[in-house]
Curated annotation (Swiss-Prot):
Subcellular location: Nucleus
Subunit and interaction comment: Efficient DNA binding requires dimerization with another bHLH protein. Binds DNA as a heterodimer with MAX.
Keyword Oxidoreductase: no
bHLH domain: residues covered: 76-128
Bias (Polar residues) ranges: 222-235
Major subcellular location class: nucleus
Keywords: DNA-binding, Nucleus, Repressor, Transcription, Transcription regulation
Gene Ontology biological process: regulation of transcription by RNA polymerase II
Classification via PANTHER family: MAX DIMERIZATION, MAD, MAX-INTERACTING PROTEIN 1
Protein name, per record: Max-interacting protein 1
Biased segments, Acidic residues type: 188-198
Region (Disordered): 164-235
Length: 243
């Protein structure tokens, strides 16, 4: 499309130039009408420039539409919030009922508030933690004692053979002196019997023995009388004399 200044077109007497200008104006008008129809159809500008000012009817319709959409969104949000709140309260009641079955509440369990129930649960948890700590300490003590007893048992098993050998050796050493003492006593008894059998008395010795026996009898009678005076028993004196 050729271009030319407006003054030249208006002042020119050339018909070809005027026809060209008119054709260009017609093309521009067709393009403007096409764009306007497209804007009315789609509601937006395809060329990127500012669109024409919408009509009053169209703007009121848009406002009503936005208001309805906003109202629907608010109603949906409110219903969703109410549903979530209802589910939360139901879950909280369920948790509180389970908590009542887990902790000791006493006879007036129906009068407990949510805060009081949570405080009692907290105190009960502390008691359980303390009991668990004591149980772990006792378990560790028992494990240490068990290890100590196992070590002692292993030592006794390892030293059982040596202890048995030591006991047998001690028994054998204890039996040897006893046998020696019994053999010695038997030999001494045999020697005494031999000495008694080999002893021979002469006539003088027999007289001295008889005299000694007579004097012993006199002494015995005197001792018996003395013992009777002193309160001693004659049987005990006889036993002492015979010994």
């Amino acid at each position: 499309m050729s271009t030319c200044p407006f003054n030249d077109v208006f002042n020119s007497t050339d018909s070809s130039m005027i026809n060209t200008f008119l054709k260009n104006v017609q093309v521009l008008l067709e393009a403007a009408s096409y764009i306007e129809s497209a804007e009315r159809k789609d509601g937006k500008c395809e060329h990127g420039y500012a669109s024409t000012f919408p009509s009053i009817q169209h703007s009121s319709y848009q406002r009503q539409r936005k208001f309805r959409n906003k109202k629907c969104n608010n109603n949906h949000y409110r219903s969703t919030h109410n549903e979530l709140e209802k589910n939360r309260r139901a879950h909280l009641r369920l948790c509180l009922e389970r908590l009542k079955t887990l902790i000791p509440l006493g006879p007036e369990c129906s009068r407990h508030t949510t805060l009081g129930l949570l405080n009692k649960a907290k105190a009960h948890i502390k008691k359980l933690e303390e009991a668990d700590r004591k149980s772990r300490y006792q378990l560790e003590s028992l494990e240490r004692e068990q290890r100590h007893l196992r070590r002692r048992l292993d030592l006794l098993r390892d030293g059982g053979g040596s202890l048995e050998a030591e006991r047998i050796r001690t028994d054998s050493m204890g039996s040897t002196p006893c046998s020696e003492r019994s053999d010695r006593s038997d030999s001494d008894q045999e020697e005494m019997e031999v000495d008694v059998e080999s002893t021979e008395f002469s006539h003088g010795e027999l007289d001295s023995v008889s005299t000694a026996s007579t004097s012993d009898l006199d002494d015995h009678s005197s001792l018996q009388s003395t013992a009777s005076d002193e309160g001693y028993s004659s049987c005990s004196i006889k036993l002492a004399f015979s010994s």
